[in-house]
Amino acid sequence: MVNKDDRIRPVHEADGEPLFETRRRTGRVIAYRFFSASVFVCICLIWFYRIGEIGDNRTVLDRLIWFVMFIVEIWFGLYWVVTQSSRWNPVWRFPFSDRLSRRYGSDLPRLDVFVCTADPVIEPPLLVVNTVLSVTALDYPPEKLAVYLSDDGGSELTFYALTEAAEFAKTWVPFCKKFNVEPTSPAAYLSSKANCLDSAAEEVAKLYREMAARIETAARLGRIPEEARVKYGDGFSQWDADATRRNHGTILQVLVDGREGNTIAIPTLVYLSREKRPQHHHNFKAGAMNALLRVSSKITCGKIILNLDCDMYANNSKSTRDALCILLDEKEGKEIAFVQFPQCFDNVTRNDLYGSMMRVGIDVEFLGLDGNGGPLYIGTGCFHRRDVICGRKYGEEEEEEESERIHENLEPEMIKALASCTYEENTQWGKEMGVKYGCPVEDVITGLTIQCRGWKSAYLNPEKQAFLGVAPTNLHQMLVQQRRWSEGDFQIMLSKYSPVWYGKGKISLGLILGYCCYCLWAPSSLPVLIYSVLTSLCLFKGIPLFPKVSSSWFIPFGYVTVAATAYSLAEFLWCGGTFRGWWNEQRMWLYRRTSSFLFGFMDTIKKLLGVSESAFVITAKVAEEEAAERYKEEVMEFGVESPMFLVLGTLGMLNLFCFAAAVARLVSGDGGDLKTMGMQFVITGVLVVINWPLYKGMLLRQDKGKMPMSVTVKSVVLALSACTCLAFL
């Protein structure tokens, strides 16, 4: 274990240069503030218009519709104000890793990396070990680095894959160090260099292919090679004959011990599958993280912890030193609890078909959150101080390191007890210690409580992305993922940890509003749904909802629409996107709010009423071959029956029928007045155009990725029924 003199001391203490710099771009921010002020003035004018016109020569139905539109536009305006908090004070962090090297040399703090997986089918073992191998080769002293794999599936196959990775690491890590390999994931590196490998790389590639073949063969056959069971008998013997993924004891195996005093020049590598029993709630990923915190404290006890999802491989091995520049800075770093990197992906199509990158979020909004006190903790790509995530408040003295109080030869059974399903009973784990329980987005609520204890966080988004993962490759996966996020964020809003009252007086108003941007995703579904439906139905019925184009009151409506759209496009292009990418982003904005967020809202309400419980849904990391080809060609994938698809299909067909009826009326000259209904034509027309991939999937395509016929029929019937009923009102 760590000796008492193994403290982090600067090699050159007289060197007072900061390890990072924080910069602001005041000119651009001031210009944006003027722009946002002009938009807000027009929003207020829209409200005044709605109030002033609500009683003018209207039927009861007209007044009701007008009032609903007014309420919805109040929500849009107030939510827009909330979103400005993440744009008014952006900051950029610039680490100086060369200064870190001069000041500390190799005397860096111990770093424990937590990689979490839960299902060997959805998260293939070969993908998992590529992530593990990528972090074993980080630009960091190997004796100070430990990698822990938490396998919540309790899979022998995953353990076998890790044993293979441990053997391959003996070749891979020295190779990476010698040739400065980037990225350090074998699969990513070898695929990027497939046509230009030298002899050394060819030998490594051969060993990797052999390892991959053994792992994939074991996965396909569903059994572990007998020689592996013999070689790693201590590990495999920990599985009971009747063990299942939901019912098994703690399995702990140190596959590589790379601590000081050992001859192996690769990091420590540990496998952990915590105990699970049907009668005990396991608290999903949060429970796995807390088990890792306790177990690692008795093995390596790194002062810094990096946690990664099993698909997020290290793309930039220098990112670790960049994070330490923030955390070890003698002046400003002492108030930073965690450093968050963005969640980026290596399988996103050129035009980001499903809006997975969330470009504006990582390149704009998180910079603004950083300026207000720090970004959210998003559950992956984050460097934590161990004592802070375990409960230390800002200003409290740092406790003696756990590793200084424990013995080298602590019995494995004593360590395994820390991962038992009963260990946390009558303790503060999941409450005041570790990752919080009781919420589908345990990461966000954990980061919020850390910041409310007086700490700040920092955001780093280097030019070379630090970590890359696997984005959803079909629409259903994306919607399910967003449903869980929106549900969890809304649960936070309604809980005792709501940033509005829990954060009051503890974090800045700007950061409170920044959290509210995400916590209000779910309820924002209702105004969007109402607005899109009412606009189309009133166009169908010939009821005007907006001022005439010739009226001066049209100006604020037109300005807000054009200005917001133009700025959104410019912002997206500035973030490195394409026009088609922006258009795809707008489509996903609509789909998320009318399906994922809507169901997230309903799930939260049902949970509050005691009707249902939250569930943690794992996003699949692989796709079948035909679906993968369609994804590469940017063809939208439906393929499964889903209530969310039924909502999207019904709304899409409703927009189409209403627009077609209005155009027919306009062409025939029977009550179609563009001057009166112009804005409704534009809004409904845009909805029809943006839904073109949906219509293709429902009506034109014949491949397996099309919309299921049952969903199409139900959608058409529901949309026609709505139009028919409205026609007789």
From Swiss-Prot:
<dbReference type="Pfam" id="PF03552">
    <property type="entry name" value="Cellulose_synt"/>
</dbReference>
<keyword id="KW-0961">Cell wall biogenesis/degradation</keyword>
<feature type="transmembrane region" description="Helical">
    <location>
        <begin position="29"/>
        <end position="49"/>
    </location>
</feature>
<dbReference type="InterPro" id="IPR029044">
    <property type="entry name" value="Nucleotide-diphossugar_trans"/>
</dbReference>
<keyword id="KW-1133">Transmembrane helix</keyword>
<keyword id="KW-0812">Transmembrane</keyword>
<dbReference type="GO" id="GO:0005783">
    <property type="term" value="C:endoplasmic reticulum"/>
</dbReference>
<feature type="active site">
    <location>
        <position position="152"/>
    </location>
</feature>
<feature type="transmembrane region" description="Helical">
    <location>
        <begin position="64"/>
        <end position="84"/>
    </location>
</feature>
<protein>
    <recommendedName>
        <fullName>Cellulose synthase-like protein E1</fullName>
        <ecNumber>2.4.1.-</ecNumber>
    </recommendedName>
</protein>
<comment type="function">
    <text>Thought to be a Golgi-localized beta-glycan synthase that polymerize the backbones of noncellulosic polysaccharides (hemicelluloses) of plant cell wall.</text>
</comment>
<dbReference type="GO" id="GO:0016760">
    <property type="term" value="F:cellulose synthase (UDP-forming) activity"/>
</dbReference>
<dbReference type="InterPro" id="IPR005150">
    <property type="entry name" value="Cellulose_synth"/>
</dbReference>
<keyword id="KW-0333">Golgi apparatus</keyword>
<dbReference type="GO" id="GO:0005634">
    <property type="term" value="C:nucleus"/>
</dbReference>
<keyword id="KW-0808">Transferase</keyword>
<dbReference type="GO" id="GO:0071555">
    <property type="term" value="P:cell wall organization"/>
</dbReference>
<feature type="active site">
    <location>
        <position position="443"/>
    </location>
</feature>
<feature type="transmembrane region" description="Helical">
    <location>
        <begin position="644"/>
        <end position="664"/>
    </location>
</feature>
<dbReference type="GO" id="GO:0030244">
    <property type="term" value="P:cellulose biosynthetic process"/>
</dbReference>
<feature type="transmembrane region" description="Helical">
    <location>
        <begin position="553"/>
        <end position="573"/>
    </location>
</feature>
<keyword id="KW-0328">Glycosyltransferase</keyword>
<feature type="transmembrane region" description="Helical">
    <location>
        <begin position="526"/>
        <end position="546"/>
    </location>
</feature>
<feature type="transmembrane region" description="Helical">
    <location>
        <begin position="680"/>
        <end position="700"/>
    </location>
</feature>
<comment type="similarity">
    <text>Belongs to the glycosyltransferase 2 family. Plant cellulose synthase-like E subfamily.</text>
</comment>
<feature type="transmembrane region" description="Helical">
    <location>
        <begin position="709"/>
        <end position="729"/>
    </location>
</feature>
<dbReference type="GO" id="GO:0000139">
    <property type="term" value="C:Golgi membrane"/>
</dbReference>
<keyword id="KW-0472">Membrane</keyword>
